[in-house]
Amino acid sequence: MDSTNQNLFASLSKKGPVRKENQDFSVVTFNRFGQLMSLVCDGLGGYKGGKMASALVSEVFTKSFTVFDFHSQTERAVKQWFEITLIEARRTLEQYFQTIKRNQVQFARMATTLVLSIISKQNIWTFWVGDSRAYLINSYQSLQITEDHNLYNQLLQMHATPDVIASYKDKLLALTATVSKDQERQLKYSFRCDVVNAWDFLLLCSDGLYNFLDPNCFYEVITSAPNLKKAVTQLAKLSLDNASNDNITLNLINLKQWH
């Protein structure tokens, strides 16, 4: 599945070679105020219901984005919008589970990652939960602007010693935050704001892409392609050539075309 809007954005999501289904979900859309949202969700493949979780969470955020004007909003107001929508997403997952639990009790742990960026005027507001990523790209660098919510990074934040980190060697990539139906758990997400005019491209992607590509290649691959659609196709192909075994999803925004 892919979508494009001329020279502004391109999106691609495809099933990995050893996956039974594509549990990723992506959206690139405008709201009624002319602002743009790019979103990627990666449903947890280890649990039943990952595909439905990513689709439902994407739907909730898309609906909420459509009616909210981000222009001239304070950081606090934008964060409040995200928190309210995240709570609604949790509630939606719980409601869905209640309708099917009699026959699908294994859906109890359905969950997804989430990364989204909203572009309004010259601001790029980025939120994330889990390990789907966002990169800002220009000719000088590909800057990862998200930090994976996993055990390794949590241990680093706790200033754990190398020996302690090594003791968790088989669990370091375990996620420490996801979007699930667990409404009792404290909200955990991260946020940052960047400016459009310092960058050429914004890339959001799932780990099926970034785990198998060197980010330093992003700019050359994108700018060597004749258009954005070919660029996302080439990035996906390169990750497969490098033995990606996961679902691959990416949204690419041409910030030079943003006015």
Swiss-Prot record:
The keyword Magnesium does not apply. Its EC number is 3.1.3.16. Residues 8-255 form the PPM-type phosphatase domain. One of its GO terms (molecular function) is protein serine/threonine phosphatase activity. It is an enzyme of class 3 (hydrolase). The keyword Hydrolase applies. Keywords: Hydrolase, Protein phosphatase. It catalyses: O-phospho-L-seryl-[protein] + H2O = L-seryl-[protein] + phosphate; O-phospho-L-threonyl-[protein] + H2O = L-threonyl-[protein] + phosphate. CDD domains: PP2Cc (cd00143). This is Putative protein phosphatase. It comes from Mycoplasma pneumoniae (strain ATCC 29342 / M129 / Subtype 1).
